A protein has these predicted regions:
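AMP-binding/adenylate-forming catalytic core of the ANL superfamily
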Residues: 87, 93-96, 104-106, 266, ...
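Conserved AMP-binding A3 loop
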Residues: 30-32, 167-203
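Structural core segment of the AMP-binding/adenylate-forming
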Residues: 47-48, 78-151, 483
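Gly/Ser/Thr-rich phosphate-binding loop
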Residues: 243-246, 270-275, 285-350, 355-361, ...
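Conserved pre-ATP/AMP-binding loop-to-beta segment of ANL
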Residues: 153-171, 177-178, 183, 213-222
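Conserved AMP-binding/adenylate-forming core of the ANL superfamily
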Residues: 2, 18-63, 67, 71, ...
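Conserved AMP-binding/adenylation subdomain of ANL enzymes
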Residues: 190-226, 230-272, 291
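Flexible, low-complexity linker/hinge segments
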Residues: 1-3, 135-166
Length: 539
């Protein structure tokens, strides 16, 4: 047995085969059934020519098929690749090509988007289509129905030996806004982000992979990850729970539905609800406030956020509405795994502050640890179990993963300081990226699209604090002439080229943008202009 993620899952499935692993709509799968379906998919992919090292894309909403796709790839020593189903043609084309996809598992409703770019990618000629109730046309050469493929494949666990050195890749936004693949070893991601065999996170990780079955909880934790599996934090939560013998309750496909989530919490006796910051917390709170007698959520122990931090306002509303429940902020990144967490049972009014272990530090410009209580600001960093680098991007790898005095550190780009008690206070991204509802938006990418509009002479894109989304994307524009651009024109221009969350929500027109002699935009000035304009619009 190794630290390969498939090996680890199989050991848990053999320990609690009849325990419920996944609840997804009407489908309820035990660990044995999830294992069998994953085996069938793996054998089918192998028959299609997928082998060790090949990349298999997953363009799916949350469902058992997403987990089956990941496990099937791991069983073959192949690599599952997360695909953001909100991407439009240009973004999909880049990701499919950059990730070297050899196969794609997708929900039927995404088939037209895939067909629009697949013909340009000769390597991608295998498509497993999961039915989702839509009638979207399937115009993909090499497409086949997912369930039909499973029925015709072997359920046996018959695969070559695997390794903890096998690859795990998760795609995230890059410095240009285009997605970049972060490459991990299985062993490293298991310890950095998936619990390390320590289900209650008390620092008692396993020393050998054979120990994992002994760490399976006698009473399973029931977790509901409302965040999509196409993001790292949701994947990590899912495998953390599976490696502990927990039960995953998955949300219905389609738009985010707060009432449906509360109904699932009640029906399935959910203990842990995991969401993405205020973008999900606010509508959940509003739905519960409107009908607080409707749902019995006494089983709920904690509400956690991954991908975006809760605002103090959201924490206060949750604490008032659900007294005694833990409200947990998670600290981490695709380049570091989980770094720490902060839990409250009441309102939090100060900046995010986290307890971390000795593998996490704040490093100054000389790459020395920032001393506790010094007040100095540095870059958040992690050593030990860190990624290999970025897929096909040696320059970014060298900039993000650095060796300091014989130790390799990951520097994800967050700025922080160390409090007198040793806790880390997070100050924000060192880059210009905007975090809106847990999604990263990079100004340069949006600006490039906007600058192509004939009515825009110059533009800077910034993030402005927003009570629901964390930040909202705002375009500060110098129009070519008065009235040359408005929000409707802007939306129409952006829609075919950008995912919806990247499209600016607000437009602020100015006579001139401030730039340096070298042409660099003054983002601080633009952000303040945008903030004032939005405040005056609601005054």
């Amino acid at each position: 047995m190794t630290y390969n993620l498939a090996d680890l899952f199989e050991s848990v499935a053999d320990t609690v085969p009849e325990r419920e692993a996944v609840v997804a709509g009407e489908r309820r799968l035990s660990y044995a059934q999830l294992e069998e379906r994953s085996n069938r998919l793996a054998h089918h992919l192998a028959a299609q020519g997928i082998a060790a090292g090949d990349h298999v894309g997953l363009m799916l909403s949350n469902g058992s098929e997403y987990l089956e796709g990941m496990l099937a790839a791991y069983k073959l020593r192949a690599v599952p690749i997360n695909v953001n189903y909100r991407y439009v043609a240009g973004e999909l084309r880049h990701l499919f090509d950059d990730a070297d996809l050899a196969a794609l598992v997708l929900h039927r409703r995404f088939a037209p988007s895939v067909a629009a770019v697949a013909r340009e990618l000769p390597r991608l000629r295998r498509f497993a289509v999961v039915e989702d109730g839509s009638a979207a046309p399937i115009e993909l050469t090499g497409a086949y129905h997912y369930e039909t493929a499973l029925r015709s494949a072997s359920p046996r666990r018959e695969f070559p030996p695997r390794s903890g050195d096998d690859r795990y890749i998760v795609y995230t936004g890059g410095t240009t806004g285009l997605p970049k693949g972060v490459v991990w070893r299985h062993e490293d991601i298991f310890f950095a982000a998936m619990g390390g065999g320590d289900p209650v996170q008390m620092g008692n990780v396993i020393r050998r992979p054979e120990e994992l079955p002994s760490r399976v909880l006698s009473q399973p934790l029931v977790a509901l990850p409302a965040a999509p599996f196409m993001h790292a934090a949701a994947q990590w939560l899912a495998f953390h729970e599976l490696f502990a013998g927990g039960t995953l309750v998955l949300t219905p496909q389609g738009a985010f539905d707060p009432e449906a989530i509360w109904a699932l919490v009640e029906r399935e006796r959910v203990n842990l609800l995991v969401i993405v910051g205020d973008a999900m917390a606010v509508p959940l709170v509003e739905a519960f406030e409107a009908r607080r007698e409707r749902w019995n959520v006494s089983s709920l122990v904690a509400i956690a956020s991954g991908g975006a931090l809760f605002s103090p306002t959201a924490k206060a509303r949750i604490a008032e509405l659900l007294p005694g429940k833990l409200v947990i902020d998670g600290l981490g990144a695709s380049e570091t795994g989980q770094l720490g967490r902060k839990a409250n049972t009441g309102a939090a009014t100060q900046a995010p502050q986290f307890r971390v272990n000795d593998e996490t530090a704040v490093l100054d410009e000389a790459m020395l640890r920032v001393e506790a209580g010094s007040g100095r600001v540095g870059r958040l960093a992690r050593r030990g179990h860190v990624p290999i680098g970025y897929h096909k991007d040696p320059a970014k790898t060298a900039a993000t993963f650095v060796e300091v005095r014989g130790e390799r550190w990951a520097l994800p780009g967050d700025m922080a300081t160390v409090e007198a008690d040793g806790s880390i206070r997070l100050l924000g991204r060192g880059s210009l990226s905007i975090n809106t509802g847990g999604e990263k938006v990079f100004p340069e990418e949006v600006e490039a699209v906007l600058k192509a509009h004939p009515g825009i002479a110059d533009v800077v894109v910034v993030g402005v604090p927003d009570p629901r989304w964390g930040e909202r994307v705002v375009a500060v524009v110098k129009p070519c002439a008065p009235g040359a651009i408005d929000m409707e024109c802007l939306r129409r221009h952006c829609a075919p080229q950008l995912a919806s969350y990247k499209v600016p929500r607000d437009l602020v027109c100015v006579d001139e943008l401030i730039r340096s002699p070298a042409g660099k935009a003054d983002y601080r000035w633009a952000r303040e202009i945008a903030r004032r304009a939005l405040l005056s619009s609601v005054a």
